[in-house]
Structure formats: structure tokens, C-alpha cells
């Protein structure tokens, strides 16, 4: 991961100093899979943990926003720089750029910088999930939802008709699985993860559904699992090294998404970010 970050930074600041080379003949399915797993899981675990830890105080939230904004600018530059490079490394760097942009949105949300209309950021009385409650839930974090769509729209615009659309695919998949998880929590799951929201966002727990799994959870897992298997097949049989690398990265996101939904449906605690939560004082 550090080597990938350093090379990506060199490409942004001094593109002429970094030769455009991809030794496709040395790529094997196992190597592509391991590299993809390392990049996606490493970023997912460390970025999520950092977001939790930075909610410790107003000062750390501000620091988190500054750092995330700087990385988002770098991420945007990577998306633009790599959009004409249909190589495995181009796919990885475009993924990294999209991940930085997505992380900026999440940091802004969890730091309560971009959430929704202030009048809506209050707990609501308990009631069964329904359309009215769903509309209020979306309205309570409207700016956050619109910001995600705006970032996706920008990625779509700058990668349209380009050979490397990995950033757009990544952001779209992030958004889709995020919405699927949110709707499942709204309808009800065994393990919604109460207590993870920082104090300014604690009101969102009033929109959590009953502590039981709804019909949507197994259906969501089945659909995501089917898509992930298809993505793995494309990653193994893709016509080009770029396509194989891109689909392998997306398939790892799919695997993590299936695992996340399974954890939501299981009455257990998985200590993935205990150290980060301890820093926050959770």
C-alpha cells in the first residue's frame, strides 16, 4: 500500500518521472486477487477505523476534515490522470482516487459537517418502518445524500467516453451497497450497530428498525453474492489485464459487502475496530 501511494503521488506531481509500465505477462489470477484484496481491505479497514477515531473531539474532527479534504483533492487528480490509462495499475490508482473521494464524504458526515437540515437532526418517536418515516429519514441527512450523488456525478462526467472508468464504477458500487445496508437497517436487522454514531448523529438511531431481520436481508445477500460471483468470473476471464484487475477490485468490494450484511443479521459483536473506538472513547 505505501508503495502504491508513493507512486501515485509521483504520477500526480511529476508524471514524466514515472514510466507507464505494466508487465501484464507477470500477472497471474492469484497475484491479481491478492493485490486487490490487500488494496481494498487495507483501505476499508484503516479508513473506517480512522473515521471512528477522529470523532474524539471537535479538534480531531476538524483535523480529520482537513486531512480528508487534502486526500480528496489528490483522489480527484488521480481520477483525472488515470482516466486514459487502461492498465492494471491505472485501475488500482483510479480505485484509490475514488476511495479518497468517498472517504471525504464519510468524514464530513461523521464529523457532522455535512448531514442535513438542522431542524431535521432530532430524534423521532418510535414507529413501524413505513414510507413516511423513510422520507423523514432521508430528509434528516439530505445534504449527505446529495453530496454522495454530486461526487458520483463528477466522476461520471470526467470519465465518460474514457477508457478507464474504474473511479465511476467504484463510487457507484460504494453508493449502492451503502444504500442497501441503510435500507436493511431501517427495516430491521438483528445487529444494527447501535452506539457507533458520534453524539451529533445519535438521533439517526431513532430511525433504526426493529431488532429482527426483515425479508430484505436474505434477498440482499443473495443478490449481492450472485453479482460478486459474476464479478469474480469476469476477473478471471476478462479479455484484458485492465479488465481483470478492475473486476477483481470490484469483486472484493462485493465480498466485503456480503460480509457486512451477514454481520448485520447476526447477533454478535465483531471487534474489527476496537482500538480505534478506544481512541474515540467509545
Task: Give the role of each language-model region.
Residues 49-62, 80-85:
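Short, hydrophobic transmembrane alpha-helix segments
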Amino acid at each position: 500500500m505505501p508503495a502504491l501511494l508513493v507512486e501515485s503521488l509521483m504520477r500526480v506531481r511529476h508524471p514524466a518521472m514515472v514510466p507507464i509500465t505494466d508487465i501484464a505477462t507477470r500477472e497471474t489470477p492469484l497475484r491479481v486477487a491478492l493485490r486487490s484484496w490487500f488494496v481494498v481491505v487495507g483501505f476499508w479497514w484503516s479508513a473506517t477505523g480512522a473515521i471512528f477515531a477522529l470523532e474524539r473531539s471537535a479538534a480531531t474532527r476538524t483535523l480529520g476534515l482537513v486531512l480528508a479534504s487534502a486526500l480528496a483533492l489528490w483522489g480527484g487528480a488521480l481520477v483525472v490522470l488515470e482516466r486514459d490509462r487502461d492498465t492494471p495499475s491505472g485501475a488500482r490508482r483510479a480505485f484509490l482516487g475514488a476511495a479518497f473521494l468517498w472517504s471525504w464524504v464519510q468524514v464530513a458526515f461523521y464529523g457532522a459537517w455535512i448531514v442535513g437540515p438542522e431542524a431535521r437532526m432530532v430524534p423521532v418517536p418510535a414507529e413501524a418502518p413505513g414510507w413516511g418515516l423513510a422520507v423523514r429519514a432521508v430528509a434528516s441527512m439530505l445534504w449527505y445524500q446529495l453530496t454522495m450523488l454530486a461526487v458520483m456525478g463528477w466522476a461520471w462526467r470526467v470519465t465518460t467516453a474514457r477508457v478507464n472508468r474504474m473511479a465511476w464504477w467504484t463510487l457507484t458500487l460504494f453508493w449502492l451497497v451503502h444504500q442497501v445496508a441503510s435500507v436493511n437497517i431501517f427495516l430491521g436487522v438483528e445487529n444494527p450497530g447501535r452506539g457507533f454514531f458520534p453524539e451529533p448523529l445519535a438521533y439517526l438511531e431513532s430511525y433504526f428498525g426493529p431488532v429482527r431481520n426483515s425479508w430484505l436481508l436474505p434477498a440482499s445477500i443473495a443478490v449481492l453474492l450472485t453479482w460478486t460471483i459474476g464479478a469474480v468470473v469476469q476477473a478471471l476471464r476478462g479479455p484484458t489485464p485492465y479488465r481483470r484487475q478492475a473486476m477483481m477490485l470490484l469483486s472484493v468490494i462485493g465480498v466485503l459487502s456480503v460480509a457486512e450484511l451477514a454481520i448485520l443479521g447476526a447477533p454478535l459483536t465483531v471487534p474489527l475496530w476496537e482500538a480505534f473506538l478506544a481512541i474515540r472513547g467509545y
